[in-house]
Amino acid sequence: MGPISAPSCRWRIPWQGLLLTASLFTFWNPPTTAQLTIEAVPSNAAEGKEVLLLVHNLPQDPRGYNWYKGETVDANRRIIGYVISNQQITPGPAYSNRETIYPNASLLMRNVTRNDTGSYTLQVIKLNLMSEEVTGQFSVHPETPKPSISSNNSNPVEDKDAVAFTCEPETQNTTYLWWVNGQSLPVSPRLQLSNGNRTLTLLSVTRNDVGPYECEIQNPASANFSDPVTLNVLYGPDAPTISPSDTYYHAGVNLNLSCHAASNPPSQYSWSVNGTFQQYTQKLFIPNITTKNSGSYACHTTNSATGRNRTTVRMITVSDALVQGSSPGLSARATVSIMIGVLARVALI
């Protein structure tokens, strides 16, 4: 009661600029028989933020309040007091110039540190000079830093290499989470978590494992995400495809073949005809072919990064005679001759 009956000084509450001030002006507890309680908002705070110890169910017509650090009423640990009759505020030994008390007994603490973690006791002085106490708690946690991802292999070979991602830095009392393509980590026997979930290992990577990958670190008060990381998965070449798919040609036309194989990095291409090397190109062009150009046409693909190579062979027949269904072998002159013959026969009928 000392601070209420004989305050050492008179302070003005710095209402302007404080978080939640407007709501606190209007939040005055009506008479109630409910139990006196303290709600910490938030109950888990990040360092440097604010915590409001919000009081619920004040006794009717109290004379004043005192706040204490800890679970008991201890004059040496008194933070601040408030006298309702004259709005007098008295700081105590535990006051740190970061606390603001409001007319409804709520206490705002600014720029909290981990040393502020713990219990706080409110003493309410009633009209009969009897007191009622209640205790609340909150915890302060470090602000989570922005994490980063390190990798033991950013250019893995498909179906051969494994990749281990590590989320940095290592911090205490922190939860590590992983995200792939913006989604939570799927369940897969090829994905393994270790080192307290700090390390994500991809076994036998495939070309679909490009990403992006993100790691998140969180504690009860805050969370932070890393920048996304992608993999450059080396793969292929797959079996090359030769186009067009025609195998019969008529002498005199141009042979124009193209080869393609899925590969990262892009494959190197070469052609051979009947076992004889022709050229290092993706396309093969032979003008005015003859029957001597019949044979096996092989497209060879090589990926120097993966050390792999694939070959596809196409058997091509060049004939002087027209082959039904072999449109690439029909010259324009032959097509016109056929059409004239058909029209003449129709006219005779």
Curated annotation (Swiss-Prot):
Superkingdom assignment: Eukaryota
Segments forming domain Ig-like V-type: 35-142
Pro-sequence residue ranges: 321-349
Tell me the GO molecular function terms.
protein heterodimerization activity
The GO cellular component terms are: azurophil granule membrane; cell surface; extracellular exosome; extracellular space; plasma membrane; side of membrane; specific granule membrane; tertiary granule membrane
Keywords (A to Z) from UniProt: Cell adhesion, Cell membrane, Disulfide bond, Glycoprotein, GPI-anchor, Immunoglobulin domain, Lipoprotein, Membrane, Repeat, Signal
> What residues show lipidation of type GPI-anchor amidated aspartate?
D320
Glycosylation positions? Answer: N104, N111, N115, N152, N173, N197, N224, N256, N274, N288, N309
> Could you state what the record's PTM comment says about this protein?
Glycosylated.
Annotated CDD domains? IgC2_CEACAM5-like, IgI_hCEACAM_2_4_6_like, IgV_CEACAM_D1
Q: Which Pfam families match?
A: Ig_2, Ig_3, V-set
Location in the cell reads: Cell membrane; Cell surface
Ig-like C2-type domain residues are 145-232, 237-319
Major site of localization recorded for this protein = membrane
UniProt keyword annotation of Oxidoreductase present: no
- The cysteines joined by S-S bonds are C167-C215, C259-C299
Is Signal one of the keywords UniProt gives this record?
yes
User: GO BP, one example?
Assistant: heterophilic cell-cell adhesion via plasma membrane cell adhesion molecules
Topology class, membrane: Lipid-anchor; GPI-anchor
- Stretch forming the signal peptide: 1-34
Q: In which tissues is it expressed?
A: Expressed in leukocytes of chronic myeloid Leukemia patients and bone marrow.
Q: What is the effect of changing R78Q?
A: Inhibits heterophilic cell adhesion
Q: What does this protein do?
A: Cell surface glycoprotein that plays a role in cell adhesion in a calcium-independent manner. Mediates heterophilic cell adhesion with other carcinoembryonic antigen-related cell adhesion molecules, such as CEACAM6. Heterophilic interaction with CEACAM8 occurs in activated neutrophils.
The written remark on domains in the entry is: The N-terminus Ig-like V-type domain is necessary for heterophilic intercellular adhesion.
Subunit notes for this chain? Monomer. Heterodimer with CEACAM6; heterodimerizes via its Ig-like V-type domain.
Report what the protein is called.
Cell adhesion molecule CEACAM8
- Source organism per entry reads Homo sapiens (Human)
